[in-house]
Amino acid sequence: MPEGHVIHRLARLLNDAFAGEPVSVSSPQGTFAQQAAQLDGHVLERAEAWGKHLFIHFAPGNGGASGTVGGAGAVLGPERIVHIHLGLIGTFRLQPADVPVTGQIRLLVSDGTTVAHLHGPQWCRLITEEERDAAVAKLGADPLRPTDPDNLATLDDVHARVARSKRSLGSLLMDQKLYAGVGNIYRAEVLFLLGISPDRAGVGASREDKEQIWELLTDLMAQGEASGRIDTVRPEHTPEAMGREPRKDDHGGEVYVYRRAGQPCLVCGTPIATAVVEGRNLFWCPTCQAE
């Protein structure tokens, strides 16, 4: 499942391509056709991400007739935000409009120069501003909204809830009601980099633990948003520095423990351990992260 940095990067790319412009909107697959027709020709105001959720806001003014951009059309009603969650297999990509797009396309957005195409999302809905606010209210603090006042208020609550919890940090970090946008890779890598056992309970975590987890999530996810991949290894542990083969994985990036079960730790040589926590395989070093 794409982690939050992917969704924030996607929101930025959508804004770069379409923000402030009228766009054509369609659903070649047909599942979202009725909603797409309402949006067709309207101005795409902005895209935003909160955790793993993407919200695309459209202006309430007149839209174009079907298949046009910028013509006169119906006024858009209160349902003018597209809410997307990619789930495990969804993809949303941008490319030049003159390059053919294939496959089952749930949503197609274009300005004639660039096209964005959505495939296989967990959901793609047309919602109101109130429904967007309600969805965000259910989410925890987002490391990629470090200066958002609402997010910082949520973070204070998250730290308090973690401090009272008997659940392990390996479990808590996957809870989207606490850490919005954090997924399996960042969970494993952050705990390793801080030398924290994934079995440590929230109630047993120090204030420093919680603050360091948040700060590292903020830094690493910002790097991931900028580069489009997850890299967590320090310079001294890169393939070039260690004379080892680069990691070969569909997720890309150089990491310490994620999907490295049984392989030697890049720091101490201990075989990386794995266990299922919150329905996903968690990875850690029993030596570097000893409790």
Regions found by a protein language model. Name each.
Residues 69-195, 201-204, 213:
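Phosphate/anion-contacting hairpin/loop surfaces
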Residues 1-127:
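Gly/Gly-Pro- and Ser/Thr-rich, intrinsically disordered tail segments characteristic of DNA damage-repair
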Residues 3-6, 10, 19, 132-135, ...:
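Alpha-helical structural motif
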Residues 22-35, 67, 161-291:
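Basic, nucleic-acid-binding surfaces and adjacent catalytic neighborhoods in DNA/RNA-processing proteins
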